[in-house]
Each structure stands twice: as C-alpha cells, then as structure tokens.
Amino acid sequence: MRFGWWENTVVRNLDYREAWAAAMRRTVDVEEDIGCEPALSVVRMGDTTAATASIAQIPVRSNARGWELTAHPSLESRRVDGAWREIRDLAEELVIGRTQRLMVHVEGPWSFGANVEYRGHALLRDRPAFRDCAVTLGEAVAEAAQWWSEAMGSAGNPAEVIIAVHEPRVAEVASGLSGSTDFDTFDPVDRQILAGVWERFASQVQRPMVLNTHGPLDDGVVDAVGASEWEAVVVAPEQLQSSAAKDRIGQLIGTGQRIGWALGSVEVTAGIEGGESTAVKMLNQWRQWSFEEAMLPRMVDVVVPEGVRTKGEASEAAAAARIAVSSLVKG
C-alpha cells in the first residue's frame, strides 16, 4: 500500500479550525501528482501521550515526570477530551467530501507504558496493568478509526483510515528502560515480546499501520519490526549515515518491508529545493542498495519528521515531501 508522503507535524499557534484548513491546503488542495491518494493527518495536539489516553478513556494526570494513571478523570484529561470533541466536530463540518484517506496519530503501547506511571513507576513495571492498558488502547483505537472511517466517508463508501503509531521510547524499552530513580531499572524486553504486543495491537485495530520510532532503528527494534507487520516504517536521516546502518535498512527492504524516508533537517525547511535534494538522495541510496529503480516509488514514501512547527514551516516541509515524491513518480 502506497501513501506517497505523510506528515508528523504539530502546528502551533493555530486554533483547531485554522489547523484543519491549513492541513487540507498542505495535503488535499495541491497540484503535485504523487501517484496515489494523499493521507490527510487528523489534527494533532501537542502531547501525544495525553491525546492517546483520551482516545482510550484512560484517566491520567500530570506529575513532575510526565503522566500517571489516576482513578478519576483529571482536569487535564477533561481538557483533552474537550479538544478531541472539537477536532471531530470541525472535521464533520470541514473535511467530509474533501478526502477519502485519513491518518490518525497515536502513541504505541510500548511508549505509552513507558511514559505513563502507575504507583510511582513506569506502567511497564506492572505487567497486568500494562497488559490491561495495552488491550484497552487497541480496542479504543479500533473504535476511533471506525468513527473516522464512517464519519468522513459517504454512504457505502467509508473513508480509508491509517494509524500512525508513534513509539519514541521503544529503543529504551528494548535496551532496558530507566526508572524514576537510579535503583529503579527495567530489564530489556525481548524482541519477540516487542513484536507480540505490536501484533496484538494490530489484530485489534485491523487498519493499515505505520511505525515511527522518532530515531534510528537499532538491531533489536529492526528484528521486532521484521517479526510484526507494518505498512511502512519511518527511517530517520541519521539512520543512513553509516554503512552498517544502511545495510540494516537495506536488509529490511529486501524482506519486503516498505519504509518512510524522513526528510533531513536541511531539506525539511527548504521547500521545493529540499524536495528535489531528497529525491536525488533517495535515488542514489537506492542504487547503492542495488534494488530495481522501478521499485523505489512502490517501496518508499517520504515523511515529514516529528516536530512542532509554525503554519509556514509546516507548509515548507509538506512542499518538500510532495516534490520529492512527485519527482520519483515522474522518473
């Protein structure tokens, strides 16, 4: 399944109505031919952990280190719930009929378990509690995706919904998560267990999913990716700086895994020139891997990396991604 490109952008200093309008100008109301239907990202809030907890109706409250489970909804939980209601209401007003493909961004179970505390420790430390939350999360994301599909589609033609799973802390989980104190440590999680939790999540959600770890993929995470199923896995620019890292990604592609090529720090701010530069880099690297050039547009999407941006910065980054994909599609 091709996506062409997608963005991992939180736009600051915009209300949700403006954010929806700007997102459609970046994604839907464009001239570039990317060879497939673009995926419009559902407007995001600044904190993915809190937004994901709200989707799952898991009550949390903030503490000095981040978030912790609570027995009853906190003021922060209610505020995020209200934001989601506004985002959905505006989508029904502004988005219906404009696109048939949407991307919903959520935090993955491993990073959620690392970012949320339970009884003073990372949720991961309590296996039954982590399992219950992970299962609840999977069920809730499935329900949310169903709502977006039905609400944004038309009679007999539901919208396609892709789930962008953000796992910024999975590398820490795989290598041994640090606790709230020097004496609070968490053993490394085996790659098969990593993959197993992802597979259970996927079986619940039943939607195309893309994985974003917000950084390089080490051996353990790559093995877990290979043992699970993702439509695409985001590859950070720094992942392609060493021969060993390039080989690791090349081997992953060789197994049939599609990747999302994240724009570099220079290209993401350079608009059209950044897109043209990215297309050249992608083609050169593809040739180094010795894959057939005709496979490149089918196996690689372009991704705007995770970031908080102004409306102008978001537009520049999206333009770079669209130009890169369009250049590759045109050959």
Identify the role of each PLM range.
Residues M1-E107, S111-D126, F130, A227-E229, ...:
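Alpha/beta catalytic barrel-like cores
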Residues E7-L14, E107, E167, L211-L217, ...:
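Structural motif
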Residues Y16-A23, R79-L90, R131-A144, D187-F201, ...:
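Well-ordered, non-membrane alpha-helical segments in soluble/globular domains
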Residues I96, S203, I253-G254:
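Anion (oxyanion) recognition and catalysis
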Residues V104, V141, V302:
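Conserved, mostly hydrophobic/aromatic
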Residues G120-C133, A164-D187, G215, G264-I272, ...:
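Active-site-proximal beta-alpha loop/turn segments in soluble metabolic enzymes
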Residues T136, A140-S243, D247-R248:
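Active-site loop segments of alpha/beta catalytic cores
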Residues E231-G331:
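Catalytic-face loop-and-helix region of soluble metabolic enzyme cores
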